[in-house]
């Protein structure tokens, strides 16, 4: 079931890329996923590189699962690093379990902080680029951490996706955004 489902999604991504590039080869083909790869197999998506073998890291990965990574099909890939623990050190202190929207059960480990997520994504993407995403409303109660997550995503990923601007506008978080971008080397 895991292989069949993932193969169908990867086959669809290949077909969609072909159609997009046939219409206009200059258009970037891309996607968004959550960053929680250890449980993303539950929704049938293998956004890793075809050169990464998840069977070496995860007991759920079948021997053929590695054949259906689709990272090489993408020109643009954004992922949701939607974590309030920013550093690995901070995560290890809180050791909190995370229950993402697509998860059947709570997850834990260094995947579930921004720094750890970026580190693990670099490993599974095998040189394919990714843009780290943030969820602004997670930081209403601690705006300084908004600056930290922006900085970490800019330093450890290949860009920044902000979800979404309405939260920055409504809570007037421009100062925190500017600080994070400066500290992340983008301003």
Please give the residue ranges for each predicted region.
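Glycoside hydrolase catalytic-domain groove-lining segments
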Residues: 1-141
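Aromatic-rich peripheral "rim/lid" segments of glycoside hydrolase catalytic domains that contact
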Residues: 141-159, 163-187
């Amino acid at each position: 079931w895991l292989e069949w489902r993932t193969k169908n999604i990867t086959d669809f991504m290949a077909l969609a890329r072909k159609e997009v590039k046939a219409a206009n080869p200059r258009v970037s083909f891309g996607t968004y996923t959550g960053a929680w790869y250890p449980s993303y197999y539950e929704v049938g998506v293998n956004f890793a590189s075809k050169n990464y073998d998840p069977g070496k890291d995860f007991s759920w990965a079948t021997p053929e699962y590695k054949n259906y990574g689709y990272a090489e099909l993408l020109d643009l890939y954004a992922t949701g690093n939607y974590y309030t623990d920013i550093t690995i050190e901070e995560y290890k202190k809180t050791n909190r379990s995370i229950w993402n929207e697509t998860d059947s059960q709570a997850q834990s480990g260094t995947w579930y902080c921004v720094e750890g997520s970026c580190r693990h994504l670099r490993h599974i993407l095998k040189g394919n680029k990714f843009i780290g995403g943030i969820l602004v409303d997670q930081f209403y109660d601690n705006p300084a951490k908004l600056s930290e997550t922006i900085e970490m995503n800019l330093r450890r990923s290949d860009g920044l996706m902000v979800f979404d601007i309405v939260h920055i506008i409504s809570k007037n978080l421009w100062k925190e955004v500017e600080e994070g971008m400066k500290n992340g080397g983008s301003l």
